[in-house]
């Protein structure tokens, strides 16, 4: 068997920075003198989350958190997805030291939403339940709606201000597929005369998808490695399926399907929240047969 890796795969810079930040803090906190928390799951990867838990890192339930809780002398890390400004204020009031590991690209989208909500309506494209979009929406201060696909963009009720020739801006979830975003923008342009579209898709997403498409020409089957709850991994897997090559989505080496061993050349790619050691383990197990 031959195993070929996509030219671009695994951790993106934003996720790597967030993980490295927490790992460094955990190593400095070996005597557990103060609590170390992440506000919500740091990344959508079960293996990494288990490793962090074993190092004493705890996860705060974002939905049930209140500023009344006492986190004095603790450290709370904001994950790469970011959080709304109101939540950040609550964290600071809890007495904890707050470390912001929000991805720089998400911060840029937050700034766009804040700036343009003063004069226009903000429309976000992507998963309405995703932490990133929830964080960005918080900066639009109520002048915002989220559309998840082109069909929704064509039918969703728009505020009266837009019906009266008002202006709007469109901001994408950083992990959305370019084709999905273009379709949403096209549908909205037919309904909003003054719509400014910002390209806020992270190159890490499109780079992984492009590398996967290129890899598909060189292999017999594809394995996509990543958390099944990860938005970018699910989109990467859909790209693999679209190549028409046999494709599987796995979280780690234990999930490698038996069927894969009937193929001679296997292509490997991984989502932006998949650590290097998991990719290495999958490749090793494939080569061992």
UniProtKB/Swiss-Prot annotation:
Record note on cofactor: Binds 1 [4Fe-4S] cluster per subunit.
Binding-site list for [4Fe-4S] cluster: 12, 103, 202
Binding site for (2E)-4-hydroxy-3-methylbut-2-enyl diphosphate: 44, 81, 130, 174, 230, 232, 273
Molecular function per GO: 4 iron, 4 sulfur cluster binding; 4-hydroxy-3-methylbut-2-enyl diphosphate reductase activity; metal ion binding
Record EC number: 1.17.7.4
Chemical reaction(s) catalysed: isopentenyl diphosphate + 2 oxidized [2Fe-2S]-[ferredoxin] + H2O = (2E)-4-hydroxy-3-methylbut-2-enyl diphosphate + 2 reduced [2Fe-2S]-[ferredoxin] + 2 H(+); dimethylallyl diphosphate + 2 oxidized [2Fe-2S]-[ferredoxin] + H2O = (2E)-4-hydroxy-3-methylbut-2-enyl diphosphate + 2 reduced [2Fe-2S]-[ferredoxin] + 2 H(+)
List of catalytic residues: 132
Annotated keywords: 4Fe-4S, Iron, Iron-sulfur, Isoprene biosynthesis, Metal-binding, Oxidoreductase
Residues given in the record as isopentenyl diphosphate binding sites: 44, 81, 130, 230, 232, 273
Residues that bind dimethylallyl diphosphate: 44, 81, 130, 230, 232, 273
Disulfide bonds: none
TM region(s), chain numbering: none
Essential cofactor(s): [4Fe-4S] cluster
Pathway: Isoprenoid biosynthesis; dimethylallyl diphosphate biosynthesis; dimethylallyl diphosphate from (2E)-4-hydroxy-3-methylbutenyl diphosphate: step 1/1; Isoprenoid biosynthesis; isopentenyl diphosphate biosynthesis via DXP pathway; isopentenyl diphosphate from 1-deoxy-D-xylulose 5-phosphate: step 6/6
Cited CDD domains: lytB_ispH
Top EC class of this enzyme: oxidoreductase
Family classification: Belongs to the IspH family.
Job of this protein: Catalyzes the conversion of 1-hydroxy-2-methyl-2-(E)-butenyl 4-diphosphate (HMBPP) into a mixture of isopentenyl diphosphate (IPP) and dimethylallyl diphosphate (DMAPP). Acts in the terminal step of the DOXP/MEP pathway for isoprenoid precursor biosynthesis.
Protein name as catalogued: 4-hydroxy-3-methylbut-2-enyl diphosphate reductase
């Amino acid at each position: 068997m031959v195993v070929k890796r996509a030219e671009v795969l695994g951790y993106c810079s934003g996720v790597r920075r967030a993980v490295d930040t927490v790992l460094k803090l955990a190593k400095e906190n070996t005597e557990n003198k103060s609590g170390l928390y992440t506000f919500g799951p740091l990344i959508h990867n079960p293996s990494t989350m288990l490793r962090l838990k074993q190092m004493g890192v705890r996860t705060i339930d974002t939905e049930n958190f209140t500023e009344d809780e006492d986190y004095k002398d603790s450290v709370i890390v904001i994950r790469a997805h970011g959080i709304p400004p109101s939540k950040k204020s609550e964290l600071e009031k809890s007495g904890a030291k707050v470390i912001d590991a929000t991805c720089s690209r998400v911060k840029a989208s937050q700034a766009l939403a804040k700036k343009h909500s003063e004069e226009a309506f903000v429309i976000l494209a992507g998963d309405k339940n995703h932490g990133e979009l929830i964080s960005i929406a918080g900066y639009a201060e109520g002048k915002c709606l989220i559309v998840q696909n082109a069909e929704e963009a064509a039918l969703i009720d728009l505020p009266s201000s837009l019906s009266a020739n008002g202006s709007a801006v469109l901001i994408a979830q950083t992990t959305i597929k370019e084709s999905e975003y273009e379709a949403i923008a096209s549908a909205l342009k037919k309904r909003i005369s003054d719509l400014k579209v910002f390209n806020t898709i992270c190159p890490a997403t499109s780079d992984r998808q492009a590398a996967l498409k290129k890899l598909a020409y060189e292999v017999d089957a594809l394995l996509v490695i990543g958390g099944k709850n990860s938005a970018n991994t699910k989109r990467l897997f859909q790209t693999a399926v679209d190549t028409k090559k046999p494709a599987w989505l796995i979280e780690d080496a234990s999930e490698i399907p038996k069927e894969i061993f009937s193929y001679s050349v296997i292509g490997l790619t991984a989502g932006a929240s998949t650590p290097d050691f998991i990719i290495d383990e999958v490749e090793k197990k494939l080569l061992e047969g």
